[in-house]
Amino acid sequence: MANVSKKVSWSGRDRDDEEGAPLLRRTGQPDEETPLLNGAGPGARQSHSALFRIGQMNNVELDDELLDPEVDPPHTFPKEIPHNEKLLSLKYESLDYDNSENQLFLEEERRINHTAFRTVEIKRWVICALIGILTGLVACFIDIVVENLAGLKYRVIKDNIDKFTEKGGLSFSLLLWATLNSAFVLVGSVIVAFIEPVAAGSGIPQIKCFLNGVKIPHVVRLKTLVIKVSGVILSVVGGLAVGKEGPMIHSGSVIAAGISQGRSTSLKRDFKIFEYFRRDTEKRDFVSAGAAAGVSAAFGAPVGGVLFSLEEGASFWNQFLTWRIFFASMISTFTLNFVLSIYHGNMWDLSSPGLINFGRFDSEKMAYTIHEIPVFIAMGVVGGILGAVFNALNYWLTMFRIRYIHRPCLQVIEAMLVAAVTATVAFVLIYSSRDCQPLQGSSMSYPLQLFCADGEYNSMAAAFFNTPEKSVVSLFHDPPGSYNPMTLGLFTLVYFFLACWTYGLTVSAGVFIPSLLIGAAWGRLFGISLSYLTGAAIWADPGKYALMGAAAQLGGIVRMTLSLTVIMMEATSNVTYGFPIMLVLMTAKIVGDVFIEGLYDMHIQLQSVPFLHWEAPVTSHSLTAREVMSTPVTCLRRREKVGIIVDVLSDTASNHNGFPVVEDVGDTQPARLQGLILRSQLIVLLKHKVFVERSNMGLVQRRLRLKDFRDAYPRFPPIQSIHVSQDERECTMDLSEFMNPSPYTVPQEASLPRVFKLFRALGLRHLVVVDNHNQVVGLVTRKDLARYRLGKGGLEELSLAQT
């Protein structure tokens, strides 16, 4: 059972009715004792106040029993609350994935005839095509710039190393390598830390949250895209243990969000197209297509992109959306393939389907037998354990960063330090290695000879002195004997910790390729070891085990199964290994989940995001809507005084975003629910002065169209920017035409799983709780549901924090 220690009201505090309460109704039963799950009596209840600041010294409201009786009210005393995963942030708002079916919406829908409906559908397909084209072009730009900048850097360093190997003074080569890496990473980190912090990392957790219904500030803005693309180029060229494939998912999502709106709010340009799609519901579907197009461009895997969007991203799905997402993915792959083929001088040879090409695995030369399946499962176990270790280390590292490295300047210094350490460690390992291999048959672009004989190269450099994508291909396809076990073991150990340290830096970067590279290294080592131990012919090609190890390691870290299986199959152009890859990924996920969550889910929790999973906690049937709902609720009347509305919207302590509308009755009679209206709608109504004087109630207030609301979307002005005179405060606003007259409601006795299923499946933002007389008694929001989760000790309730 849950240890429910706090009950946090929707408004963040309990308030008595103030003057003017007859016009502004606060419903609910704050004086009634709410049963506790642990059986504690009324005396054990704590205050509703539970507002904290994470990682900062700020004013907080503490529970009454925690206060020193000799001190003044808590507002004057700061307290730092250590950040942990058992906090839920109040700063995140929900997106409106349920259309408000008010009179304006219904009138517009009724006016749409069959021809207009077909036009809207055609526009959806056109937008998906544009998403695919632009995502593919962005991927081409990233790939070409990285190839040229990284090539220039490695050529300069190689020439310097070759020069000083003969005459001595390789320390200067080390200094040059570390300086170049740090310089690139410095620029990449500065633009992220100081201009757009949301562009840090791969962006996959943020896009998952957006598609789940959480409004992440700036996550799909044009500025974020520019910083993301620039940052990932500089991170990869800077030699960090990162990849450019993960951020393509975020980039595709931003492109989709921008194209589908037909305007740029950042550039203040409105092209007057696609106005019908200016709402969260439509934008969500296009962002799903953008995420899939990003995967498709990264790996040349259009089907894998669709499945990734389904498995990891989209919370809401339908058949027509599947077709459009697949179409966008195919267009993205083709665009990338076509442009890169032209760039490489083979205009009609479409041989570059993705940013990374794993190369073709020959089924005849690398066939597997039934006896190898247990070996593959064992590799999945290893991948799950190593993935759990990776995630656990990254968890503690992220906690340290949240507490101590939260200033932008410190974040930039850390990124530069990691870049310098990565270059230093790579140089030392290459310098110390005596693993020399013949140049003939090598796939190295920049072979380093160092102390090897003429015609040979240092094999440790094949892993370190290259972009991560090329290193993965080298481990997959270099012939047997290209690496000795000591080289692979050292590389795996060192790169594992470097990748773990790198993920979470304030740079734009992904974890896909580093995970594949780590897994390919220990997988190849695994195959070599089996060959030594058994001497059997079936163990002959270590590239096969490098592929399985790569899948196991990536699956153990991110815990994807279905989509990753198809991505690996499409990227290798080989269906033969579909079954063993699936076994490896499933085993890695099962083993990893025993110890810790996947990397993306872990970082979502660390950011205290109110993320709703597919199902409610399995042990939550004992909870009802009455126990989880927020009370008291601020309600408005059908015809409300403008001054009351302005005061409600200006209340920064509550920051309400949805208001039940009740019937106009006397103060002595209970008010029944009539509808629901959003803060954003009220803002637009106030901006356009949609009200009349109380003395002239017979006048008709100004009419608005849906276009007026869409023009204000998505950056609705704050209430502070709207001037309302004292005379206007006495006017009256009729909400009947703008409220949603049929909001979803549940009775107080509804179980939490039932409430959760309704809220989650319909993409709701507010769910009204009513009694037997249809009177509002509470409101269920995303945070009310997200704060209950299944912990190691059973059902637990998270604390709400103002981060």
From Swiss-Prot:
Residues recorded with modification Phosphoserine: 9, 799
Mediates proton transfer from the protein to the inner aqueous phase, annotated site positions: 312
Membrane topology: Multi-pass membrane protein
Span of domain CBS: 629-693, 739-797
Annotated catalysed reactions: 2 chloride(in) + H(+)(out) = 2 chloride(out) + H(+)(in)
Binding site for ATP: 656-658, 781-784
Role played: Slowly voltage-gated channel mediating the exchange of chloride ions against protons. Functions as antiporter and contributes to the acidification of the lysosome lumen and may be involved in maintaining lysosomal pH. The CLC channel family contains both chloride channels and proton-coupled anion transporters that exchange chloride or another anion for protons. The presence of conserved gating glutamate residues is typical for family members that function as antiporters.
Stated family: Belongs to the chloride channel (TC 2.A.49) family. ClC-7/CLCN7 subfamily.
Annotated protein name in UniProt: H(+)/Cl(-) exchange transporter 7
Source organism per UniProt: Mus musculus (Mouse)
